[in-house]
Amino acid sequence: MIIVTGGAGFIGSNIVKSLNDIGYRDILVVDNLKDGTKFVNLVDLDIADYMDKEDFIASIVAGDDLGDIDAVFHEGACSSTTEWDGKYMMDNNYQYSKDVLHYCLDRNIPFLYASSAATYGGRNDNFIEERQYEQPLNVYGYSKFLFDQYVREILPEAESQICGFRYFNVYGPREGHKGSMASVAFHLNNQINQGENPKLFSGSENFKRDFVYVGDVAAVNLWFWQNGVSGIFNCGTGRAESFQAVADATLAFHKKGGVEYIEFPEKLKGRYQAYTQADLTNLRAAGYDKPFKTVAEGVAEYMAWLNRTV
């Protein structure tokens, strides 16, 4: 059995899909379905069982036998960069992750988890997986950074796989439940389908991010599990592309509309990453040599998926 926490969420459900694609169906999804809309991410997928997150935490803290587990993909977290309830964030992201990690270490279960490029903070170069480059801007980034630090202390003595991935700007299928935290491609598509012009902040040709397609993110997770590699790795394309490029790819699919530029919001000034670009040196050195989709390629595939029934 494989456990995917956050398995009804964006990246988690895409990992479930990728496992299904290689014939794996003995999957336990752990999630919190208080937001019932997330169930749609699972309806076309095959899983063996579902467990509520609180019940799962109680089970692992009690040391319950959950059966023969091949791996845990720990994607369950609060991923909102605008959430400032630090107690909630540390319970949900840091303590929960420690509980799952120790359950896995005690049983030699491979543990692969979601870190984040938010650990780097507002820098605009040297996105390298080393302490000197890490200075998160928000409590979400701090919760991810602190768990990475915890893992770094444990890694040298660990007898089973521990692997963390610093996800950059992930976009693609099954993110609709994320609301305002969904990708810009998702929102631009909605705006066009509602008869509006797609909207970007003024200067969006200068705002560049490492936009990585969720299918590529799932592929990275599966490769590292199958190859037993441990460590903390950036998970992006290694390319910074502009928000304008995302809009251009969206418009190219729809063949209508033009970008409308709006003022940059005051509340985001100083808390907004204007530039991200994953350094893939360590990922490539670990042996992962598959290509990553460009924005033009990934957005085209995503638009086809989003509009398949429209």
Swiss-Prot record:
<feature type="active site" description="Proton acceptor">
    <location>
        <position position="178"/>
    </location>
</feature>
<feature type="binding site">
    <location>
        <position position="187"/>
    </location>
    <ligand>
        <name>substrate</name>
    </ligand>
</feature>
<dbReference type="GO" id="GO:0008712">
    <property type="term" value="F:ADP-glyceromanno-heptose 6-epimerase activity"/>
</dbReference>
<dbReference type="InterPro" id="IPR011912">
    <property type="entry name" value="Heptose_epim"/>
</dbReference>
<feature type="binding site">
    <location>
        <position position="170"/>
    </location>
    <ligand>
        <name>NADP(+)</name>
    </ligand>
</feature>
<feature type="binding site">
    <location>
        <position position="180"/>
    </location>
    <ligand>
        <name>substrate</name>
    </ligand>
</feature>
<keyword id="KW-0119">Carbohydrate metabolism</keyword>
<feature type="binding site">
    <location>
        <position position="144"/>
    </location>
    <ligand>
        <name>NADP(+)</name>
    </ligand>
</feature>
<feature type="binding site">
    <location>
        <position position="92"/>
    </location>
    <ligand>
        <name>NADP(+)</name>
    </ligand>
</feature>
<feature type="binding site">
    <location>
        <begin position="31"/>
        <end position="32"/>
    </location>
    <ligand>
        <name>NADP(+)</name>
    </ligand>
</feature>
<dbReference type="Pfam" id="PF01370">
    <property type="entry name" value="Epimerase"/>
</dbReference>
<feature type="binding site">
    <location>
        <begin position="75"/>
        <end position="79"/>
    </location>
    <ligand>
        <name>NADP(+)</name>
    </ligand>
</feature>
<feature type="binding site">
    <location>
        <position position="272"/>
    </location>
    <ligand>
        <name>substrate</name>
    </ligand>
</feature>
<comment type="pathway">
    <text>Nucleotide-sugar biosynthesis; ADP-L-glycero-beta-D-manno-heptose biosynthesis; ADP-L-glycero-beta-D-manno-heptose from D-glycero-beta-D-manno-heptose 7-phosphate: step 4/4.</text>
</comment>
<dbReference type="GO" id="GO:0050661">
    <property type="term" value="F:NADP binding"/>
</dbReference>
<feature type="binding site">
    <location>
        <position position="209"/>
    </location>
    <ligand>
        <name>substrate</name>
    </ligand>
</feature>
<dbReference type="InterPro" id="IPR036291">
    <property type="entry name" value="NAD(P)-bd_dom_sf"/>
</dbReference>
<comment type="function">
    <text>Catalyzes the interconversion between ADP-D-glycero-beta-D-manno-heptose and ADP-L-glycero-beta-D-manno-heptose via an epimerization at carbon 6 of the heptose.</text>
</comment>
<feature type="binding site">
    <location>
        <begin position="201"/>
        <end position="204"/>
    </location>
    <ligand>
        <name>substrate</name>
    </ligand>
</feature>
<feature type="active site" description="Proton acceptor">
    <location>
        <position position="140"/>
    </location>
</feature>
<dbReference type="GO" id="GO:0097171">
    <property type="term" value="P:ADP-L-glycero-beta-D-manno-heptose biosynthetic process"/>
</dbReference>
<dbReference type="InterPro" id="IPR001509">
    <property type="entry name" value="Epimerase_deHydtase"/>
</dbReference>
<protein>
    <recommendedName>
        <fullName>ADP-L-glycero-D-manno-heptose-6-epimerase</fullName>
        <ecNumber>5.1.3.20</ecNumber>
    </recommendedName>
</protein>
<dbReference type="GO" id="GO:0005975">
    <property type="term" value="P:carbohydrate metabolic process"/>
</dbReference>
<keyword id="KW-0413">Isomerase</keyword>
<feature type="binding site">
    <location>
        <position position="178"/>
    </location>
    <ligand>
        <name>NADP(+)</name>
    </ligand>
</feature>
<keyword id="KW-0521">NADP</keyword>
<feature type="binding site">
    <location>
        <position position="38"/>
    </location>
    <ligand>
        <name>NADP(+)</name>
    </ligand>
</feature>
<feature type="binding site">
    <location>
        <position position="169"/>
    </location>
    <ligand>
        <name>substrate</name>
    </ligand>
</feature>
<feature type="binding site">
    <location>
        <position position="53"/>
    </location>
    <ligand>
        <name>NADP(+)</name>
    </ligand>
</feature>
<feature type="binding site">
    <location>
        <begin position="10"/>
        <end position="11"/>
    </location>
    <ligand>
        <name>NADP(+)</name>
    </ligand>
</feature>
<comment type="similarity">
    <text>Belongs to the NAD(P)-dependent epimerase/dehydratase family. HldD subfamily.</text>
</comment>
<comment type="subunit">
    <text>Homopentamer.</text>
</comment>
